[in-house]
């Protein structure tokens, strides 16, 4: 049988999602817990491999198993064997044709900036602190040139293994809640560090160091060295993965935490 799971995790204590030798990964911890419940070795496939320090509230995985368990056992039982910073949010038996990665039509990320002169100890690791009072409206306007199917070479990490820099951005919204600025971006897929590289350059616009038109210019140059430094992994969350309705994948409120859609100033598409 094939099982899909919704996964939430705090990435601060992990060297990314993907299993690696001699370092902790989210994938390894989840596979160990699932293997305990299934009484057999479990290999999982995820919708999106997040980097070291990046968190997820809407990750989706699937695995195949010979074990027959009720859905609640895959959720509650697995959670009992996971560390506190990883949790199963839902479990569902899916059709054989479902694949967590290849069946997905889009991924959605949110990047959280905390704009305050002094940093916060409580929020450390969950947000990126910015001592400047950024202009969220200018950041939003600057980001609109990135919509649609385009070449994102200027926002692509040098070590990116993708065969093409072309991606299709469905929406990019920048909103403010008090001292928090939320960059919300959805695309069919992302090149390596794409969200963090975009946010790094949007910060330059929000700080007044570059004009709104700078983002369009960067996009046209297709040169990563001309864009701003990569934003930190702190504050980046994989919040949703979109699938065709036929798979009936469960949906949860878009996070993280208090940042549900209804609380944002700008309606999200």
UniProtKB/Swiss-Prot annotation:
Residue sites binding substrate per the record: 109
Enzyme class: isomerase
Active-site residues from the entry: 51 (nucleophile)
Pfam families according to UniProt: PseudoU_synth_1
EC number: 5.4.99.12
GO terms under biological process: tRNA pseudouridine synthesis
GO molecular function terms noted in the UniProt entry: RNA binding; tRNA pseudouridine(38-40) synthase activity
UniProt-listed InterPro entries: PsdUridine_synth_cat_dom_sf, PsdUridine_synth_TruA, PsdUridine_synth_TruA_a/b_dom, PsdUridine_synth_TruA_C, TruA/RsuA/RluB/E/F_N
Transmembrane feature ranges: none
Keywords (A to Z) from UniProt: Isomerase, tRNA processing
Catalyses which reaction(s): uridine(38/39/40) in tRNA = pseudouridine(38/39/40) in tRNA
Family that this chain belongs to: Belongs to the tRNA pseudouridine synthase TruA family.
Role summary: Formation of pseudouridine at positions 38, 39 and 40 in the anticodon stem and loop of transfer RNAs.
Quaternary organization: Homodimer.
Protein name per Swiss-Prot or TrEMBL: tRNA pseudouridine synthase A
Organism of provenance: Haemophilus influenzae (strain PittGG)
Gene field: truA
């Amino acid at each position: 049988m094939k099982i899909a799971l919704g996964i939430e995790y705090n990435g601060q204590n992990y060297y990314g999602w993907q299993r690696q030798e001699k370092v902790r990964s989210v994938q390894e911890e989840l596979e160990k817990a699932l293997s305990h419940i299934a009484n057999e070795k479990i290999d999982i496939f995820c919708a999106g491999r997040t980097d070291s320090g990046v968190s997820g509230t809407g990750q989706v995985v699937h695995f195949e198993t010979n074990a027959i368990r009720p859905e609640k056992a895959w959720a509650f039982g697995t959670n009992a064997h996971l560390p506190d910073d990883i949790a199963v949010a839902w479990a569902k038996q899916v059709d054989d044709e479902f694949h967590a990665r290849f069946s997905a039509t889009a991924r959605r990320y949110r990047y959280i900036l905390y704009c305050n002169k002094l940093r916060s100890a409580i929020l450390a690791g969950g947000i990126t602190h910015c001592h400047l009072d950024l202009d969220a409206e200018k950041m939003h306007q600057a980001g609109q040139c990135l919509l649609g199917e385009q070449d994102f070479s200027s926002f692509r990490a040098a070590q990116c293994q993708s065969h093409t820099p072309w991606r299709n951005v469905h929406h990019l919204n920048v909103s403010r809640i008090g001292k928090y600025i939320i960059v919300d971006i959805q695309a069919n897929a992302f090149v390596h560090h794409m969200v963090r590289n975009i946010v790094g350059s949007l910060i330059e616009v929000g700080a007044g160091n570059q004009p709104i038109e700078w983002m369009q210019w960067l996009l046209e140059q297709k040169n990563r060295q001309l864009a701003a430094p990569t934003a930190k992994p702190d504050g980046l969350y994989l919040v949703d993965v979109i699938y065709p309705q036929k798979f009936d994948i469960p949906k949860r409120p878009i996070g993280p935490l208090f940042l549900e859609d209804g609380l944002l100033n700008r309606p999200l598409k």
